[in-house]
Amino acid sequence: MLFAQKSNQVALFNGKDLTGWNSYIGPPLDDAGKQLSDIPVGLNHDPNHVFTVVDLNGENVIHISGENWGCIYTPKEYSDFHLHLMFKWGKLFWGPKKGKKMDSGVLYFSVGENGADYGAWMRSQEFQVEQGNCGDYWGVAGGMETIPVIKKSDSEYVYSPNGVMTVFSAKSSVGRHCIKQGDAENLTGEWNTLDLYCHGDTSVQMINGKVMMVLYHSSQDDNGKISPLTKGKIQLQSEGAEIFYKNIFVEPLKAIPAEYLQAK
């Protein structure tokens, strides 16, 4: 399927190679997820070719093998933007993810040092990309969001537009994970679209045209100091599973469309 680029969109993937991206890979892990070394593989050093560009059915796409935990990320920071991309799962599992749901993620508003979370990722807000859970939220290394939710169980909270506004962070009583509403993911092996709208401290996470969650008051906890988190780099995770990405575009955003903020 051909993708029509808008005039104000900037392609983050040139369709040829990984020019315009940095890579970072954390310490190697055993099958239980334990670090085999304290030393990360490092910045722009990818001996296992975790991040490559491959020809898939006649189309060049980004291939993330998942063999090591890490990411590719934009050197540039973004605020007030719309990010669009497409992804689909491969078949490979590695290490602690063997036999589990295939997992990746789009980490936005990424700031600070590489490896702040699990030795692999910067502080950020995570748009979860995981089989059956695409659209969930995770706060990464101090990322915090306020989300309207209903309580599903003692430990699970689900996004609901009319729910109780609740702060999600590693230090809050509800934790740093919020479950999206509904399920819009296509069958494994099919391409999915991901759209992320961010303006100010508000974000909308969408899968295949459906609003999964609206998030408010994006902020960060830096050793007890709380401050806004509204600008940062974009990371694409490698987290133990094979995944492909393509058609990655970002464009400036003057306002989040009202219909997405009000979606039920």
Regions found by a protein language model. Give the residues of each.
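Carbohydrate-interacting regions of secretory-pathway proteins
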Residues: 5-264
